[in-house]
Amino acid sequence: MGKIIGIDLGTTNSCVSILENGNVKVIENAEGARTTPSIVAYANDGEILVGQSAKRQAVTNPHNTLFAVKRLIGRRFEEDVVQKDIKLVPYKIVKANNGDAWVEAAGKEMAPPQISAEVLKKMKKTAEDYLGEPVTEAVITVPAYFNDSQRQATKDAGRIAGLDVKRIINEPTAAALAYGMDKAKGDHTVIVYDLGGGTFDVSVIEIAEVDGEHQFEVLATNGDTFLGGEDFDMRLIDYLVDEFKKESGMDLKNDPLALQRLKEAAEKAKIELSSAQSTDVNLPYITADATGPKHLNVKISRAKLESLVEDLVKRTIEPCRIALKDAGIDASKIDDVILVGGQTRMPLVQKEVADFFGKEARKDVNPDEAVAMGAAIQGAVLAGDVKDVLLLDVSPLTLGIETMGGVMTALIEKNTTIPTKKSQVFSTADDNQSAVTIHVLQGERKQAAQNKSLGKFDLADIPPAPRGVPQIEVTFDIDANGILHVGAKDKATGKTQSIVIKANSGLSDEEIERMVRDAEANAEEDRKFEELAAARNQGDALVHSTRKMVADAGDKVTAEEKTAIEAAVVALEAAVKGDDKAAIDAKVEELSKVSAPVAQKMYAEQSAEQPQGGAQQAEPEAKHDDVVDAEFEEVKDNNKQ
């Protein structure tokens, strides 16, 4: 069995980790960084860029550079939070046929799981490069407050990326795993406060020693899946736009290129203000009008930034209060506060959290890496490599069905330990009713319409009977991933109907399979692109070395040889400009062939000049084609010396 990797699929950055020889290791990507920007870009030549390379070209390609897509995963286009995002991002958010929020880039409409899959593929490749073997299994983290559709969509993203997702695990729980594995024995209760790029979660977790086993039990969880560092950036961008408008009278809101530059500058300034008291945002040539180019230069103090985002920080405190209440614990009983997510580096966030919980947060947990590390530990538990850990997570939101009068009747209350299974008997609302529709809901409101609809299905062929007589047993079963399976059974006939809840939106199996095929086709395209690039490089090198050889040979080359070589060189140069690898290979072969006699002459002459040359005289025939590259690299080395 191969390794099960742990992936923190973040809104802003992602991270991959593995448990190796009993130690958790965060794996560096090809650029040498331990985290990878969750950014995917579609270049004009069709290439798909992921991570730092996508981030670098965002300013010049804002419409086709997709960031913070995790905020759209598993969401309907009509949702308020999606409508708000449409106004804030330079790329297009569109309505899919099933009503989901999709994105458009490079003229194609794509589902958020497809975009997330590109990031997951990069994480998968990072792990494979390090391990030197294929990786097919992963534990992927999600915000604790993700609903069923969002969890399912994350699992779909894993499938599209070619990963068998062994478990979906909540981010705060993963962070607690990373924190608690090496702690002293004994029971303690921790708060994980996770403020990431796009989401906020808080979980109350009890870490206990039970018969020598680490038991991690989530007592309660709460959060906001549309609050994070991106919102902090947006406040700063709005401020910079307003300041520039006051000074120049020009509005940068409608200029995607300027907005992308502002986004980069705002993120950089925000990070700097975590350690400095003030910083300058200096963007020359941000725009231009009839009078000439305009430059943006604004000085921002830490106090100013804090005043801009104070209400966002305050918004994180109410979920903390609710989580403590649901867990039945007073803030004073919390042993440790663990901060996770890059935004928790902000001094104001740390101060608010310390004030609320009455204690400073721990500084020995890396906020960017703890979640991926916890996912790797859970992967090792599932693989059987770690035996002394038991994880008891909870369902973050109440689950139920719509009953008469548009009421939501709960079957599984929020913060119920999972996996779990609950059944309840319902009946018909009308006489001789032959079918019932089971409408599955998730949320905390009493009115069904105010909650998230997860899906509907029908139980048909109910024998005619007066209302209230038929007995329909509805069963909710939540698996360890927090994904819901629902069944309904007519107790009189034994007839059953069941579904895995995949929302009335979500991706169908056919769509996922098509996206998997697309991803595989992209991988094939990437391989062909690499091979073509290698062939072009080989062609260029051969042209250069052949021309150098002819120049060095001088009058030792006959006019016929010179003409033949020049014709072959020109043909190879033309082939290198094209996209046909086979044509390049053929022209390389041709040039090697026509230049071989000259190479042999040069080699023989050089050997004759050396005292020990006699012993090597028999070699030219054996070397033949390879002689051009090898010989002239060697001459270069001699020249250097």
Curated annotation (Swiss-Prot):
Residues 620-641 have a biased composition (Basic and acidic residues). Residues 602-641 are annotated as: Disordered. Gene3D superfamilies: 1.20.1270.10, 3.30.420.40, Actin, Chain A, domain 4, Substrate Binding Domain Of DNAk, Chain A, domain 1. It holds the Pfam family HSP70. The keyword Phosphoprotein applies. Keywords: ATP-binding, Chaperone, Nucleotide-binding, Phosphoprotein, Stress response. GO terms for molecular function: ATP binding; ATP-dependent protein folding chaperone; unfolded protein binding. Induction: By stress conditions e.g. heat shock. PROSITE patterns: HSP70_1, HSP70_2, HSP70_3. It comes from the Bacteria. InterPro entries: ATPase_NBD, Chaperone_DnaK, Heat_shock_70_CS, HSP70_C_sf, HSP70_peptide-bd_sf, Hsp_70_fam. Residues 604-619 have a biased composition (Low complexity). The modification Phosphothreonine is found at residue 199. Belongs to the heat shock protein 70 family. Acts as a chaperone. This is Chaperone protein DnaK. It comes from Pseudomonas putida (strain ATCC 47054 / DSM 6125 / CFBP 8728 / NCIMB 11950 / KT2440).
